[in-house]
């Protein structure tokens, strides 16, 4: 596999995907429940949250994998609009992880207990990685859509509308 074919914008998708895959395994939340001197501690990672943990982990990690496979030529660039698919996957993954950052974690408790919940390093770096991947996917999509408009090397870009010929 020749990684020299990977563009710099695609490297952003790959790096962001690697961050999400690695830091999805680490601590996303830690919590401590104190009930009259009895303390219970726990921690969670991406796999404790299906919609806002596992799904974005698969989306962003899969987008990074597809990006590498496309650049290496393992997957053929067919009629599938891969830059758009990768953009959609990374943006959806980033939105879902950011939702998890916002809504936090709420351990089930009843009665008069003290609950302390804190976000872990895994959640923060997964959020950063998903944003990096989404930014790289957006830049790759922009570059590919510009390249498709100017596909003839050496020729002028195609106009957005037809200009009628002038008669002299």
Segments predicted by a language model, with ranges:
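Compact integral membrane and secretory-pathway proteins
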Residues: 1-168
